[in-house]
């Protein structure tokens, strides 16, 4: 059978027309040096700062140094799998982590991989760990409270949604306890929580997770763990990864709380990386951009304006001090970035005042606007009276003769201190806090022994639940202590006081 020449040309023309000329190009480089979790790579001329690269063993790395001939990459995996001469590919993507509701109730590493043995996670997508903070025009002032459930904080150092409030103090003063209590108190309040553990002992993280599970808080919480055994690179990216997971919810109009525990160890991890990358050291051997390290992280916390969904991301960074020195490099940096600090003191802790908050050095710069009306009314004089008591306490130690007015301040101060003491994992509802403060500030417990003040107030709250539930309901609904409710409350306190006195006489 003969083939006509014109058929051949048409078949060839068709083949040429349908031929796929597209070429897939990949930029590759080679590892020329590897050690201490750092790889130097030759050949990735167009690599971008913060970009993910992939080694031939499947391990990923992140570009942190751009030099004349080489690129410095931190290895985010097993560094032993990275050898000299290995081929490295660019991914063209900035370092990103999985995000979404599938992460709630799970413990993950900073790459978003599950480490709790509960199987794979269903993600909603991925988000870059570094993203610009919302600009001023997209923000609105902090005006909604984030209740911690801790009376001393909610009354004197209130935190608003979208605020950054530093928790600072020496080791073993209860910093993590305040953060965990705050997470537990968000139950049924529609706030998603992210707890980022940086450089903590694995046993400590396991204990926090068990506590959160015990109190039913894990269902709305994600734990991002970069324990002390992880590489400095993973500890460095952990808070950014946790922040990205929180931002996903914030941009959906939800409220998020992120705890960074703690940024002192984060700065140490970054110092380790910087020195290994041969960057010049500065004060306390930290690199020159250690301020920017924390400012770009904490500036991502915001209360978005209503046209952008009205979501919020509240940050509770934790910083550990040495011997109470808050004027060291990292503490002063983070104090200047945040909107206030809760300062915990060893002396108070060991004298049995827990949470050990030094009210004189603690402050909330923007939270006052977020307090509910009822709390503003009853707690206005609380800080002042407590400060006066602490001042006069010094003179009382000398046993000198004190006048009646001074004795009155001391008596009242002792009773205020008693209601600010609170057992761990027992957050108080805001209406209970208002009633407790009202009772003490209006001198209803002046004639009660100091050791009996807390049992009296707790008994009163229980009595109100049973006999006058409408008082608490009114405060809860109106967020105010109306004249009518106040009259009812006064009568109820006096009624309970009579019962209490009669019980004591028996």
UniProtKB/Swiss-Prot annotation:
Basic and acidic residues: compositionally biased ranges: 119-129
Pfam families linked to this entry: ATP-synt_ab, ATP-synt_ab_C, ATP-synt_ab_N
Top-rank lineage group of the source organism: Bacteria
Q: Where in the cell is it found?
A: Cell membrane
The entry assigns this protein to a family as follows: Belongs to the ATPase alpha/beta chains family.
Q: How does it sit in the membrane?
A: Peripheral membrane protein
User: Site positions for Required for activity, renumbered to this chain?
Assistant: 362
**NCBIfam families assigned to the protein according to its UniProt record, in alphabetical order:** atpA, PRK13343.1
Q: Which PROSITE patterns match?
A: ATPASE_ALPHA_BETA (PS00152)
For this UniProt record, give its keywords in alphabetical order, as a comma-separated list. Answer: ATP synthesis, ATP-binding, Cell membrane, CF(1), Hydrogen ion transport, Ion transport, Membrane, Nucleotide-binding, Translocase, Transport
Assembly information from the UniProt record: F-type ATPases have 2 components, CF(1) - the catalytic core - and CF(0) - the membrane proton channel. CF(1) has five subunits: alpha(3), beta(3), gamma(1), delta(1), epsilon(1). CF(0) has three main subunits: a(1), b(2) and c(9-12). The alpha and beta chains form an alternating ring which encloses part of the gamma chain. CF(1) is attached to CF(0) by a central stalk formed by the gamma and epsilon chains, while a peripheral stalk is formed by the delta and b chains.
Q: What are the annotated GO cellular component locations? A: plasma membrane; proton-transporting ATP synthase complex
Q: Name one GO molecular function term.
A: proton-transporting ATP synthase activity, rotational mechanism
| Catalytic function, reaction form | ATP + H2O + 4 H(+)(in) = ADP + phosphate + 5 H(+)(out)
Q: Give the EC number(s) under which this enzyme is classified.
A: 7.1.2.2
Fetch the CDD domains from UniProt.
ATP-synt_F1_alpha_C, ATP-synt_F1_alpha_N, F1-ATPase_alpha_CD
Task: Tell me the residue numbers annotated for binding ATP.
Answer: 169-176
Q: What task does this protein carry out?
A: Produces ATP from ADP in the presence of a proton gradient across the membrane. The alpha chain is a regulatory subunit.
Could you identify this protein by its name? Answer: ATP synthase subunit alpha
Where does the UniProt entry say this protein principally localizes?
A: membrane
From the UniProt entry, list the residue stretches annotated as the region Disordered: 119-138
SUPFAM superfamilies under this entry? C-terminal domain of alpha and beta subunits of F1 ATP synthase (SSF47917), N-terminal domain of alpha and beta subunits of F1 ATP synthase (SSF50615), P-loop containing nucleoside triphosphate hydrolases (SSF52540)
